[in-house]
């Protein structure tokens, strides 16, 4: 996608969702272990779960499940009984669940003050604005691209409403690259620690523990992901095994 169009459509998503996930809300107890979220970027229901994580300043290991993906989708179907997204695993509460509304309620009850913000609580409005947001980027973060699986999950500092972070998440999603998501929305008490690590308050910020590389700038991050993990052009999803290796006929 053209860079200007990519940015414009990403901004449009943020506008459609009225900036939900841009700032931290009231925080409650903090989880001892990161949550796990199986989702794909373009899904409006998955977006609700990600917005809740951003508002509640929660980390999560994200397992991208784009259409046609074979790396993590089968795990969801095996554990939950169906390939439906989002799928949240909370090891701190011992729960696993589908349904974005149930996920949002669980997160705000356990990790917030129990009150779900209007941007996530008004079901008809949320459904319509979420659908409009997805229409703004109809081809982004939807279908799998053949890729090599990293040995260890990457790390991404981000917040849901940022149009630049969204572009990076699109790339991670279509390449089925798992990553530890560190949410640092406006008002996050963890921003100071992030600045101490990265040197400035700017997101997206990607760290790849497999190569030791750390990068700012969405365009540079996407180029790095393509260069490091995308397989050659022309490969199809069925050519690539669930572990990211190329299938070879016997």
Predicted regions and their residues:
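GST-like domain detector, emphasizing the conserved glutathione-binding G-site
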Residues: 1-161, 166-250
């Amino acid at each position: 996608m053209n860079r200007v169009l990519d940015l414009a459509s990403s901004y449009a998503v943020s506008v459609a969702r009225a900036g939900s996930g841009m700032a931290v809300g009231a925080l409650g107890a903090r989880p001892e272990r990161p949550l796990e979220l199986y989702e794909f970027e373009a899904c409006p229901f998955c977006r609700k779960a990600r917005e809740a994580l951003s508002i509640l300043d929660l980390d999560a290991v994200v397992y991208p499940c784009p259409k046609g993906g074979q790396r993590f989708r089968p795990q969801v179907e095996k554990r939950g009984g169906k390939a439906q997204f989002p799928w949240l695993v909370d090891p701190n509460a011992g729960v696993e669940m589908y349904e974005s509304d149930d996920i949002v309620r669980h997160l705000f009850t356990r990790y917030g003050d129990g009150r779900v913000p209007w941007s996530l609580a008004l079901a008809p409005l949320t459904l319509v604005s979420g659908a409009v947001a997805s229409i703004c980027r109809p081809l982004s973060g939807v279908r799998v691209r053949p890729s090599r699986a990293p040995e260890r999950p990457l790390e991404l500092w981000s917040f849901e409403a940022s149009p630049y972070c969204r572009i990076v998440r699109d790339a991670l999603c279509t390449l089925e690259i798992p990553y530890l998501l560190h949410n640092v929305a406006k008002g996050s008490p963890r921003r100071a620690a992030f600045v101490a690590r990265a040197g400035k308050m700017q997101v997206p910020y990607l760290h790849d523990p497999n190569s030791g590389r750390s990068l700012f700038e969405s365009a540079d991050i996407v180029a790095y992901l393509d260069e490091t993990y995308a397989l050659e052009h022309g490969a199809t999803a069925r050519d690539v095994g669930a572990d990211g290796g190329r299938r070879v006929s016997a």
